[in-house]
């Protein structure tokens, strides 16, 4: 079974609150519309561009995406 990006992202919750990655993880957790089962870059980035007001910059997502690819 393919691991979703959301499940990967959750490992960063509850960290140092000033960390933008932690804020992203907490925001995605609270976002009921986040595509939780997806491991598709286009779907996730499109969603975040339109709905990810809790994400400071798409660069944060892109960096985490690269880590996700290397770790899964």
UniProtKB/Swiss-Prot annotation:
The record's listing under InterPro entries reads: UPF0346 (IPR010673), YozE_SAM-like (IPR023089), YozE_SAM-like_sf (IPR036806)
Q: What superkingdom heads the lineage?
A: Bacteria
Output the Gene3D superfamilies linked to this UniProt entry.
YozE SAM-like
The family database entries (Pfam families) matched by this protein are listed as:
YozE_SAM_like (PF06855)
Similarity comment text for this entry: Belongs to the UPF0346 family.
Q: What NCBIfam families does the record tag this protein with?
A: PRK13672.1
Name assigned to this protein: UPF0346 protein GTNG_1419
């Amino acid at each position: 079974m393919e691991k979703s990006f959301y499940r990967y992202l959750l490992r960063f919750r509850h960290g140092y609150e000033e960390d933008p990655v932690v804020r992203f993880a907490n925001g995605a957790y609270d976002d009921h519309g986040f595509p939780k089962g997806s491991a598709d870059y286009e779907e996730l980035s499109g969603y975040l561009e339109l709905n990810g007001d809790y994400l400071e910059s798409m660069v944060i997502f892109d960096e985490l995406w690269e880590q996700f690819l290397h770790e899964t």
